[in-house]
């Protein structure tokens, strides 16, 4: 079934708003067994909307449209839909009743401007909207049933689930299945080389690469009838990818790390400098983290490192705050202060200033202290301040996960 998506709004084309609606629609259609063949974005211009609807209506069997159903003068979608369908706008008493009831719950009376939301193409079918003022509607344009919904994401998502998808699902073939493998610490070119020949030529399993910095996602897709081949391919990729694979599908690094920490029975403390609490935020984002996470210190200044972590001032003076020696002292100090089994520290130069020839912007030291040792490693990351901080946070989580996995699989340490 040929399905298209039409997004309407000046704000989408000016870069003011990211079109999350189109992504959500495509994902839900895929899960239901459909696939978006074409996606257009047009401004709040009646002529542009009519042209887009006419074009998509001639080439599709279903068109899902979002945006332009509000009460303001630039909301022109209903008018354009009527023109493209060869009909007129008329006052929908059902839509007007919905507007009046909605207004009574919120403000007590309907604003005159909202009445124009009840002007809909003659003969259209209505799509209920329990969360907002704008009802959706369905009209036939060319060869396609066109489903119109408001651009407000939470309203659109509810209408998609309750009305649009149930109607379309019966017209789709067998559903698609997907496996997402999430990788870190390896480049796309290296992945391609590692996976060469993993999926036999002629296989009906599709493989796509998706970069979501600092992660790389490998997305395997196949129809429901090819589920065994999909699982076989996923198993082969897991075997080849090894430690680069940190999570799958909806699982995040945080979730996998939380599971390992719970299984280990170890407690953790943090000492962060350049990441400013980002690592602690990721760890505590998982419910139940209080079972293993004791405390986090953001010791941004040298004085804080000394006061909170007992890092000796002469050590900082001799080696600098961004150094292996100070990272080690931070981790050891954090572990002693918290009374934890483990302590992870980070100190670095996120930029844009502060770099030197010896320690350029992007220089980061991580340290992990346990009962018997303290491991320290230097990293040199590229990018602006946000990217350096982001990849530092992710590297720290991955580093800790690797430690826990090694401990789990080493006899006598698990």
UniProtKB/Swiss-Prot annotation:
Transmembrane segments: none annotated. InterPro entries: CinA, CinA-like_C, CinA_C, CinA_KH, Competence-induced_CinA, MoaB/Mog-like_dom_sf, MoaB/Mog_dom. HAMAP family: CinA_B. It comes from the Bacteria. It comes from Geobacter sp. (strain M21). Belongs to the CinA family. NCBIfam families: cinA_nterm, PncC_domain, PRK00549.1. This is CinA-like protein.
């Amino acid at each position: 079934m040929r399905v298209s998506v039409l997004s309407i709004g000046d704000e989408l084309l000016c870069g003011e708003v990211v079109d999350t609606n189109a992504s959500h629609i495509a994902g839900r259609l895929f899960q239901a067994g459909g696939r978006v063949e074409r996606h257009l974005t047009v401004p709040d211009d009646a002529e542009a909307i009519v042209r887009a609807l006419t074009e998509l209506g001639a080439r599709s069997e279903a068109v899902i449209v979002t945006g332009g159903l509000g009460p303001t003068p630039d909301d022109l979608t209903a008018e354009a839909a009527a023109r493209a369908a060869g009909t007129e706008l008329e006052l929908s008493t059902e839509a007007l009743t919905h507007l009046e009831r909605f207004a009574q719950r919120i403000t007590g009376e309907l604003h005159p401007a909202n009445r124009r939301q009840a002007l809909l193409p003659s003969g259209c079918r209505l799509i209920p909207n329990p969360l907002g003022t704008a009802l959706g509607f369905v009209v036939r344009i060319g060869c396609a049933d066109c489903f119109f919904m408001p651009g407000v994401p939470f309203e659109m998502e509810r209408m998609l689930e309750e009305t649009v998808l149930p109607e379309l699902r019966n017209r789709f073939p067998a559903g698609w299945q997907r496996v997402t493998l999430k990788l870190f610490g390896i480049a796309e070119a290296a992945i391609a080389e590692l996976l060469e020949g993993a999926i036999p030529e002629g296989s009906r399993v599709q493989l796509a690469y998706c970069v979501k910095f600092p992660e790389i996602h490998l997305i395997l897709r196949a129809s429901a009838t090819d589920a065994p081949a999909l699982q076989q391919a996923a198993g082969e990729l897991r075997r080849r990818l090894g430690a680069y694979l940190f999570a799958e599908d909806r699982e995040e690094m945080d979730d996998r790390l939380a599971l390992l920490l719970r299984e280990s029975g170890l407690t953790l403390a943090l000492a962060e400098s350049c990441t400013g609490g980002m690592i602690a935020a990721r760890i505590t984002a998982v419910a139940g983290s209080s079972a293993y996470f004791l405390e986090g210190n953001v010791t941004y200044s040298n004085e804080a490192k000394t006061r909170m972590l007992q890092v000796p001032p002469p050590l900082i003076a001799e080696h600098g705050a961004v150094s292996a020696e100070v990272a080690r002292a931070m981790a050891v100090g954090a572990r002693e202060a918290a009374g934890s089994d483990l302590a992870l520290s980070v100190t670095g130069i996120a930029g844009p200033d502060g770099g030197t020839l010896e320690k350029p912007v992007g220089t980061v030291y991580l340290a992990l202290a346990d009962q018997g040792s303290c491991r320290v490693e230097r990293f040199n990351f590229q990018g602006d301040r946000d990217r350096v901080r982001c990849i530092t946070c992710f590297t720290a989580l991955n580093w800790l996960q690797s430690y826990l996995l090694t401990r789990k699989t080493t006899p006598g340490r698990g």
